[in-house]
Amino acid sequence: MGQFEELLAIDSTTGDFRPIQNYVKEQIEEMGYQSYETHKGGILADLGGTGNSLVITAHLDDIGLMVRFVNPDGTLRVAKVGGLSPEDALGENVRVKTRDDRVYTGTVQKKFASVHVTEDDVAAKPLDYATNVVVVLDEDVHNAEETKALGVDIGCFIALEPRLQVCNGYIK
């Protein structure tokens, strides 16, 4: 599982795939092969051999989120990157990467998370990244200025924590 765990630990949100791309290129070169990068960021490697050619392909990037706005209370309004529905994202632990490569952890949650103090009509609304789903940072921030002082601002990529578990030989 070692290398699989290494791969999952590399944040690779679509649009921020260079770290995993570099990792795969290094692995190919450590095996003694030369890698080539396509104009769209793909990696090719000729493993040699004779006979019919075989092509193996795989995605290196992953679905995630992006900071769309820093709310006045310091939470983050986000946009999906890829096909991540708000229902599936809710409760996920995340890593927010700043432009200068600092990383902060947080959690995706409802904007009004407390069911005992939220009006029924507000709580009943469908989940939507634009209106009622936010990322709360694991930092002592209370307003937009404090969040932005961390380097977290519009356009920062947000990766989901992979939560790797192996149970009875099954990967979760």
Pin down the residues of each PLM region:
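N-terminal hydrophobic/helix-forming segments and targeting peptides
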Residues: M1-K172
